[in-house]
Amino acid sequence: IKAGELVSYELDQSFFALYNRKLAGTQVPVFSLRTRKSAGIGDFGDLKTMIDFVASTGQKVLQLLPINDTTITHTWTDSYPYSCISVFAIHPQYADLHALPELKDAKARAEAEKTRAELNALDKIDYEKVNDFKINYLRQIFNQEGEKMMKTAEYKAFFQDTELWLVPYAQYSYLRDKNGTADFNQWPDHQVWDEAERKALADPKTAAYKNVAFFYFVQFVLDRQMQEAHEHAKAKGVILKGDI
């Protein structure tokens, strides 16, 4: 092909194999799967309980509404699951806190359990309070366990596999929270994201790095928990069907 030439291919018809099989299933948003141990909202631990129910009733498919991060304003308007800020990042609200290491500080642990129980006793999900609580709890776990966890081979493999989207997502999330708005046009700096910007915010020696790394940590935790739920479904013979 020479410069200026155009080659066009046209495929008149496409054929895809259609399997002559009907499967019964259920469609749910994960946030609706509250159980007695939840923190005011359904999470990946509750998802495994739902998988057990689907399997026990002879169903074969469990379809989930999108689980992507939708955090823009940190208000209830972020609750619409189809308004995601990333096609890869998972919403922190789905973290199963019981699957995380226990808080070592007894007072902090007692306060967290009190708040969890209060949120879970509400008739309806308080989106803002639930997410504030979960982010605060995840930060405490990050401060306690993050440095050690991020040195593991498992985390390093995760980071290598996801770096292409994880780094810009984490840096954007940090700058969104730092500047109090998701509208980068209103930020005093970092309005243009390029390689120089990426390197500056990814440098462990900078003051911003720990806040950026927090989002790496949260996505690692969520990825592991979702993987566990997927393996649980596989073991139960249940298909997990996603939605975007």
Regions found by a protein language model. Give the residues of each.
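Glycan-association/targeting regions that enable binding to alpha-glucans and other polysaccharides
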Residues: 1-16
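Acidic/aromatic-lined carbohydrate-recognition and catalytic surfaces
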Residues: 18-244
